[in-house]
């Protein structure tokens, strides 16, 4: 028998501890290696150790991606506003009238026209954003600057007709809502709608207002828009249980039913009510305050003290407006703002505007279709039916939504009229005088109609106004497509100092002829002037967008030809 002494036991323990230390060191060494794993097997269950550096990298990547998404979302929130303002043009009282008529005569089959109109509206509004962002001009000022005088005045005539037709719909719709809700006579209702004129006349001053005030103004309009959406979300809960959801969704697919009961004429009315001409001027103008705010904050655009001294005879408001109208965005501002402006507008139109228009038609189609009241149905009729067949609250909520739409649309239409007159004509008047004269041009026909015609003619006047809007639409879309396709207009300049160039670029620049422009993949060029490079970046439409724009214009024009022929054959009877 061998006796193991204390020294031998100590040696055995030391050897065991050393072995454990070696294993631990190997484990930690393997942990530090990227994407390495180690498995230790013993009496205990198998344990796996994954590289800690890999875990940290994955965690850092996740955190960085999450931070990027937060930054993108925070930046997007800064651009919310113009899309809501433009969306008002697509949920005005004219939409109520045409959608009610479509639902009563064709039930849900014309939902596909609303969807198509929404896509066309988004496409055209993106062109408006592009024009306003690159040139710093709204559509009316671009017409005055780049078109012959006679053509500019012709387009001004069509634009003013569009504003007047829109005002007629807004005023009549608001007057009807006030008449039903609080029993206000129609002429008095028209007079009440003039209040929003003074609200705009004395508050909305794009050149003299800060970006913060403009955002507050946008929030005011946004509250009205959200109120309309809430009303129709509640309204849909009141529709008959027998309404087939499958049949509703089938309406988004073209069918033969859409041609029944003069459906093409109704479709043209929907197109005119959805793709509003005055929204083209509005969309191209609303993008500019954020561009200007970016350039002012980054020191890219200022008015010198010398200029202020020269202009001291002018009022502060006139100086600020002149600064605003002379502004041209820098390339940095365009890159920062344009994409987010397009995304914000597209999301708003494809959610809020599409939902409201479809909801109006679904409510009308589920309550009026195949009913004795369907023939000649108007806003009064649908209120009576909703109140009698569904619930009194249903009719009240519908009229409340109409009132909110009329008020918000009246505000936006006043802004559009101001943009049109100041852009096309460039009146040499005080700003408040221009706004008052602009509104008087539009409000007088509304007063005449509200006083002289009865309830039976109101629906026809509303639908006719939407057909007028559809007819003038191609004339106002044409210059928008022309401007955004022309490289000499859709361009911006970037100035680069030679001293900041490296030797290789400096040598290449010396080989260029002074004053020459060199094309770079058709999108940019370089011009040398006073020892500095002026890089020209072209942002005109590519051939795909150009083809789509031409197809849209031809489609609108063909529909207008059909509408004019139908009016001629029916001797002006649009019933």
From Swiss-Prot:
UniProt keyword annotation of Transmembrane present: yes
Residues on Cytoplasmic side: 92-108, 178-179, 240-266, 366-396, 485-543
Region feature (Disordered): 498-517
Lineage, broadest ranks: Eukaryota, Fungi, Dikarya, Ascomycota, Saccharomycotina
MF (Gene Ontology): cadmium ion transmembrane transporter activity; inorganic cation transmembrane transporter activity; manganese ion transmembrane transporter activity; metal ion binding; solute:proton symporter activity
Topology relative to the membrane: Multi-pass membrane protein
Chain positions found as Phosphoserine: 24
Organism field: Saccharomyces cerevisiae (strain ATCC 204508 / S288c)
Example of a GO cellular component annotation carried by this entry: fungal-type vacuole
Site of covalent link Glycyl lysine isopeptide (Lys-Gly) (interchain with G-Cter in ubiquitin): 33-34
UniProt topological domain (Extracellular) ranges: 1-70, 130-156, 201-218, 288-344, 418-463, 565-575
HAMAP family linked: NRAMP
Keyword Thylakoid: no
Keywords noted in UniProt: Cell membrane, Isopeptide bond, Manganese, Membrane, Metal-binding, Phosphoprotein, Transmembrane, Transmembrane helix, Transport, Ubl conjugation
UniProt-recorded name of the protein: Manganese transporter SMF1
Name of the coding gene: SMF1
GO biological process: cadmium ion transport; copper ion transport; intracellular copper ion homeostasis; intracellular manganese ion homeostasis; iron ion transmembrane transport; iron ion transport; manganese ion transport
Family statement: Belongs to the NRAMP family.
């Amino acid at each position: 028998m061998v006796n193991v002494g204390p020294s031998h036991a100590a040696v055995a323990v030391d050897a065991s501890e050393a072995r454990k230390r070696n294993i631990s060191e190997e484990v930690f060494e393997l942990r530090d290696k990227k994407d390495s794993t180690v498995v230790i097997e013993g009496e205990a269950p198998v344990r796996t150790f994954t590289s800690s550096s890999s875990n940290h990298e994955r965690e850092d990547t996740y955190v960085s991606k999450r931070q990027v998404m937060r930054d993108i979302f925070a930046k997007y929130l800064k651009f919310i506003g113009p899309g809501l303002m433009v969306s008002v043009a697509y949920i005005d009282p004219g939409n109520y009238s045409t959608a009610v008529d479509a639902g009563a005569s064709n039930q849900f089959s014309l939902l596909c026209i609303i969807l198509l109109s929404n896509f066309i509206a988004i496409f055209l509004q993106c062109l408006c954003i592009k024009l306003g962002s690159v040139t710093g001009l709204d559509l009316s000022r671009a017409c005055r600057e780049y078109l012959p005088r006679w053509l500019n005045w012709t387009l001004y005539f069509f634009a003013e007709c569009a504003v007047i037709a829109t005002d007629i719909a807004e005023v009549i719709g608001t007057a009807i809502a006030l008449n039903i809700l609080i029993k206000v006579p129609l002429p008095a209702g028209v007079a009440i709608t003039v209040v929003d004129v003074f609200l705009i006349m004395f508050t909305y001053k794009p050149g003299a207002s800060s970006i913060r005030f403009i955002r507050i103004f946008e929030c005011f309009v946004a509250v009205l828009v959200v109120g309309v959406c809430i009303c129709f979300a509640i309204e849909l809960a009141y529709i008959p249980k027998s309404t087939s959801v499958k049949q509703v969704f089938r309406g988004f697919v073209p069918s033969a039913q859409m041609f029944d009961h003069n459906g093409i004429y109704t479709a043209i009315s929907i197109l005119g009510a959805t793709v509003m001409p005055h929204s083209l001027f509005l969309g191209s103008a609303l993008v500019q305050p954020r561009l200007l705010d970016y350039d002012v904050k980054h020191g890219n655009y200022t008015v010198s003290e010398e200029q202020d001294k020269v202009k001291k005879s002018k009022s502060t408001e006139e100086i600020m407006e002149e600064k605003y109208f002379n502004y041209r965005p820098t390339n940095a501002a365009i890159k920062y703002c344009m994409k987010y402006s397009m995304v914000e507008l597209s999301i708003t139109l494809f959610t809020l505007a599409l939902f409201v228009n479809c909801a109006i038609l679904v409510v009308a189609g589920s309550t009026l279709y195949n009913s004795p009241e369907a023939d000649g149905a108007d806003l009064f009729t649908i209120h009576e039916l909703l109140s009698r067949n569904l619930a009194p609250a249903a009719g009240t909520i519908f009229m409340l939504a109409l009132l909110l739409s009329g008020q918000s649309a009246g505000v936006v239409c006043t802004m559009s009229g101001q943009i049109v007159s100041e852009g096309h004509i460039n009146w040499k008047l005080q700003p408040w005088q221009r706004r008052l004269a602009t509104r008087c041009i539009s409000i007088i026909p509304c007063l005449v109609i509200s006083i002289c015609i009865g309830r039976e003619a109101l629906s026809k006047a509303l639908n006719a106004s939407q057909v007028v809007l559809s007819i003038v639409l191609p004339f106002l879309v044409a210059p928008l497509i022309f401007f955004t396709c022309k490289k000499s207009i859709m361009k911006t300049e970037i100035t680069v100092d030679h001293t900041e160039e490296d030797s290789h670029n400096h040598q290449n620049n010396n080989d260029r002829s002074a004053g020459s422009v060199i094309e770079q993949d058709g999108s940019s060029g370089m011009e040398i002037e006073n020892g500095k490079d002026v890089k020209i970046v072209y942002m005109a439409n590519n051939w795909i967008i150009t083809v789509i724009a031409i197809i849209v214009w031809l489609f609108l024009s063909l529909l207008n030809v059909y509408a004019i022929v139908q009016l001629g054959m029916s001797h002006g009877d649009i019933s």
